[in-house]
Amino acid sequence: MNQTLLSSFGTPFERVENALAALREGRGVMVLDDEDRENEGDMIFPAETMTVEQMALTIRHGSGIVCLCITEDRRKQLDLPMMVENNTSAYGTGFTVTIEAAEGVTTGVSAADRITTVRAAIADDAKPSDLNRPGHVFPLRAQAGGVLTRGGHTEATIDLMTLAGFKPAGVLCELTNDDGTMARAPECIEFANKHNMALVTIEDLVAYRQAHERKAS
């Protein structure tokens, strides 16, 4: 990733710390992956604190595929089958079947309804019957080990939520341009600045975790 583009957001470690602070303050974070991978930016928010207004922003400026990143333990708790048995997607993205809250929603597609679905899925006592299938929220199962195992936005979201002190569950959506194309780094940086979001790369997070885990050992 071009560090000159990112310099206004600080050093790699500062970017991670700023992202964690933003999440704790209830703000969103823009997460960029490598230019040689998907080369896109995802807006992420804690599943616990995301507001209807933030969900509306995400739907308005994103791909429309609003995803809830969860752990394997949560997937099992909710009894969510993986979307396909044989995942042939380019990056092995861990989609489960889609979900809708069983209660408290209308069509399920509005920002308010999607927040209701997210909250139902992450409740401590959530059970499979709390969710209908299919729905308008796309759960993503993260790999154990986070970004040190798989350098994806799903794992980055779980890692950031955990480091920030939240439940390991977060909402993400890819940023798109007004013309329908995917937003790349320059557009993601402009959007993050406009909407008071922190910005971090998956590469930053990998280095941060490696450094802190070396210290811990």
Swiss-Prot record:
Superkingdom of origin: Bacteria
Needed cofactors: Mg(2+); Mn(2+)
The keyword Signal is annotated on this UniProt entry: no
Pathways per UniProt: Cofactor biosynthesis; riboflavin biosynthesis; 2-hydroxy-3-oxobutyl phosphate from D-ribulose 5-phosphate: step 1/1
InterPro entries per UniProt: DHBP_synth_RibB-like_a/b_dom (IPR017945), DHBP_synthase_RibB (IPR000422)
Residues reported in the UniProt entry to bind Mg(2+) 1: E38
Enzyme Commission number(s) of this protein: 4.1.99.12
GO cellular component: cytosol
Chain positions recorded as D-ribulose 5-phosphate binding sites: R37, E38, D42, R150, G151, G152, H153, T154, E174
Site positions for Essential for catalytic activity: H136, E174
Keywords per UniProt: Lyase, Magnesium, Manganese, Metal-binding, Riboflavin biosynthesis
Any one GO molecular-function label of the UniProt entry: magnesium ion binding
GO biological process: riboflavin biosynthetic process
Reactions this protein catalyses: D-ribulose 5-phosphate = (2S)-2-hydroxy-3-oxobutyl phosphate + formate + H(+)
Residues bound to Mg(2+) 2: E38, H153
Cofactor note: Binds 2 divalent metal cations per subunit. Magnesium or manganese.
Family listed: Belongs to the DHBP synthase family.
Functional summary from the UniProt entry: Catalyzes the conversion of D-ribulose 5-phosphate to formate and 3,4-dihydroxy-2-butanone 4-phosphate.
PANTHER family: 3,4-DIHYDROXY-2-BUTANONE 4-PHOSPHATE SYNTHASE, GTP CYCLOHYDROLASE II-RELATED
NCBIfam families per UniProt: ribB
Binding partners and assembly: Homodimer.
Record protein name field: 3,4-dihydroxy-2-butanone 4-phosphate synthase
Organism: Escherichia coli (strain SMS-3-5 / SECEC)
Gene name per UniProt: ribB
